[in-house]
């Protein structure tokens, strides 16, 4: 039996690419219709006025305006777009 391991492949070396989640437009920033405001997994931040919720829970603006974050009940946050 060989007392040295052959030149086999390592068991490491795999990783998934970053998902680039998080807030993309902060409070007070002007946005256009269709601008992504938050990318998230699940509804960590809930949609408010003038925003839409994508099927991957991405929140995006549905009209032109200014981003506004506000707290709601039970330690939840809501994001809205205040139209100009």
Swiss-Prot record:
One of its GO terms (biological process) is translation. InterPro entries: Ribosomal_bL27, Ribosomal_bL27_CS. GO terms for cellular component: ribonucleoprotein complex; ribosome. The keyword Ribosomal protein applies. The keyword Endoplasmic reticulum does not apply. Disulfide bonds: none annotated. Residues 1-25 are annotated as: Disordered. GO terms for molecular function: structural constituent of ribosome. Keywords: Ribonucleoprotein, Ribosomal protein. Belongs to the bacterial ribosomal protein bL27 family. PANTHER family: LARGE RIBOSOMAL SUBUNIT PROTEIN BL27M (PTHR15893:SF0), RIBOSOMAL PROTEIN L27 (PTHR15893). HAMAP family: Ribosomal_bL27 (MF_00539). This is Large ribosomal subunit protein bL27. It comes from Dehalococcoides mccartyi (strain ATCC BAA-2266 / KCTC 15142 / 195). The lineage of its organism: Bacteria, Bacillati, Chloroflexota, Dehalococcoidia, Dehalococcoidales. The gene is rpmA.
